[in-house]
Amino acid sequence: MGAAFKARYRRNKETLEWYDALAMAVAIIALVFTFGVRIVKVDGHSMDHTLSDGERILINLLKAPDYGDIVVVDGYTDYGKPLVKRVIAKGGDTISIDYETGTVTVNGEVLQEDYIAEPTYLGYDVEFPYTVPEGTVFVMGDNRNQSLDSRSSYIGCIDEQDILGKVLVCFLPFADFGVVK
């Protein structure tokens, strides 16, 4: 009886250790997803060819936005779905868009935008040159001629506090898995 009891005790101990490890892993994952990262679904075609409609992306909730970062803004408009756009300019910057040549200029420097689908020919109601208010960012979709973004007063500049996070990785569908730049 002593050997059977010891064997059962070892099995129960191993099972409890396994459950403890599983509970710890679940707790860590919950903390990371609560305070560090979040999953968002891309809605629409404004970021084509960088990100496509329906893709799932992982965003970093803790990183402040920088030039060229793709960010997610949640609940900013009555659209009701997260906006996914690229940071073009930050507070204090002056941006100009030449719709004839399709070029974007920030503080007198033409941006090298190898990520855009085509040159920027579509304009909205914001007049250029435009100075971005402090504490905000000017965002645009990579598919410029299919994107409603900071060029429109409907969206306008985004308050930095309204940015949910920076896009890190596209993970679904698996064929598109990779770091987003």
Where are the language model's segments positioned?
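Residue-level "contact hotspot" at macromolecular interaction interfaces
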Residues: 50, 63-64, 88, 131, ...
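RNA pseudouridine synthases
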Residues: 85-96
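Short strand-turn-strand beta-turns centered on an Asx-Gly dipeptide
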Residues: 105-108
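A generic structural signal for residues embedded in beta-strands
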Residues: 59, 73, 97, 139-140, ...
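Protein maturation boundaries and topogenic segments
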Residues: 1-82, 158-181
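Beta-strand-rich cores of mature extracytoplasmic or soluble domains
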Residues: 126, 130-181
